[in-house]
From Swiss-Prot:
Annotated family: Belongs to the class-V pyridoxal-phosphate-dependent aminotransferase family. NifS/IscS subfamily.
Binding positions (pyridoxal 5'-phosphate): 58-59, 184-186
Induction: Expressed in the late phase of the viral replicative cycle.
Cellular compartments per GO CC: virion component
This protein's record includes keyword Thylakoid: no
Compartment(s) where it occurs, according to its Swiss-Prot or TrEMBL record: Virion
Main location: virion
Organism lineage: Viruses, Varidnaviria, Bamfordvirae, Nucleocytoviricota, Pokkesviricetes
Gene3D superfamilies assigned to the protein according to its UniProt record, in alphabetical order: Aspartate Aminotransferase, domain 1, Type I PLP-dependent aspartate aminotransferase-like (Major domain)
Entry protein name: NifS-like protein
């Protein structure tokens, strides 16, 4: 899957089957109920059955769900709650459950993969009298095979099943593999975007006060949902010094990993055309002004992506470089490609944008060219 993502968070090119508003990133321009209904339509869920809660990411959504269910169980009984998780769950699920277990707030069972998927029979065999939640994603994080969520939900009975569904949605398979009791999504409405936690109302009983305090349905300054994210992205501006730091580190990484660096004639940091920037793919040390854009294009649709980007931003086209083979050669996992696809070096980068980019670049600076990326992190040297 190829994506074009701008770091101002206001535009995104993602799979065509997604609704127009999700593709164009119109965050904050309509009432919150509009976006809630969009998510329900995207997932094929009935608005009378599901609550939709916007979060900063699917990682936050997963953590909220796990923490809330465990706490609800502890409020109801003295027995330590038991959580079932799949062997190929995302780190946000496994690390949260393991941390709770270390605090002696729960116990857990890991279901191994059988024929590259989670076997419903194995889930049934793992059920205990104190089982309060099962976390089985729509796809397995390692091999990207689909799990039979509806069958797993049936064997669980009244025990809620929480599923990370981002890969299922982005592969266009949500109709064939719908969620069960609750689901999480990531990176909607732009580069940083927002996450979603969807919960069936029958599973929501007693969870509302444990999620966002009162079970809020949208975002707030402390819970960056649609409107809060939009406000943050449009108001925060980093200094040009930080942008230059990112650029220098980017150049260093590109040379080390033998990527093709593409300075494209466009807008410099002061908003004027960046004269003197070469149109070749040869790295240049110490440019007089920042390039308007650095573009990485993955897959077959480079020309289409080129047209969309430069029509949108009125930037003169230089040359598009397809780096699919390069990405394979240095073994960057596909799920991190979008982080590297499109980096816009202009004054409208936000602090969070820079932190995300810097976390990736600083890691790449410490590994050999055959290394792979860690999970995205927002920690960096920038405060």
């Amino acid at each position: 899957m190829a994506s074009i993502l701008t770091l101002d968070g206001l535009y995104a090119e993602v799979p065509k089957f997604l609704p127009e508003a999700l593709r164009e990133g119109c965050a904050g321009k309509k009432p919150l109920s509009f976006y809630i209904q969009q998510i329900l339509n995207l997932m094929g869920c009935d608005g009378n059955e599901y609550h939709v809660l916007f979060t900063s990411s699917s990682e936050e959504a997963n953590t909220h769900m796990i923490m809330a269910v465990v706490r609800r169980h502890l409020l109801r009984t003295q027995q330590r709650p038991h959580v079932i998780i799949g062997a190929a769950e995302p780190p946000s699920v496994t690390e949260c459950v393991k941390a709770l277990a270390q605090e002696k707030r729960c116990v857990y069972t890991i279901i191994p993969l059988k024929n590259f998927e989670i076997d419903p029979v194995a889930v049934y065999d793992a059920i205990q009298s104190n089982t309060c939640l099962a976390c089985i994603s729509g796809t397995n994080a390692v091999v990207k095979t689909f799990n039979k969520l509806q069958e797993i939900s049936k064997v669980l009975g009244a025990i809620p099943l929480h599923s990370e569904m981002s890969d299922v949605v982005y592969q266009g398979c949500i109709k064939q593999h719908p969620p069960a009791d609750s689901f999480s999504l990531n990176s909607l409405y732009g580069f940083l975007g927002v996450g979603v936690l969807g919960i069936k109302k029958k599973a929501m009983q007693g969870l509302g006060p444990l999620i966002f305090g009162g079970g809020l349905r949208g975002g707030s300054p402390n819970v960056p949902g649609i409107h809060a994210m939009y406000k943050t992205l449009t108001q925060q501006r980093p200094s040009i010094k930080k942008i230059n730091t990112v650029h220098k580190l980017f150049m260093k990484i590109l040379k080390k990993h033998q990527h093709v660096y593409l300075p494209i004639e466009g807008m410099s940091s002061n908003g004027m055309p960046s004269n003197g920037m070469p149109s070749s793919g040869i790295p240049v040390e110490g440019p007089k002004s920042l390039p308007g854009y650095i573009l990485f294009s993955v897959g077959r649709s480079a020309e289409e992506l080129q047209k969309k980007i430069f029509t949108k931003f009125n930037v003169k086209v230089g040359r598009i470089v397809n780096l699919q083979e390069v990405l394979f050669r240095i073994k960057i996992p596909q799920k991190y490609w979008e982080t590297l696809l499109f980096i816009q070096l202009r004054e409208d980068l936000t602090k969070e944008d820079i932190k995300r980019v810097m976390a990736i670049l600083m890691y790449l600076d410490t590994v050999t060219p055959r290394g792979s990326l860690p999970p995205p992190s927002y920690s960096s040297s920038f405060s």
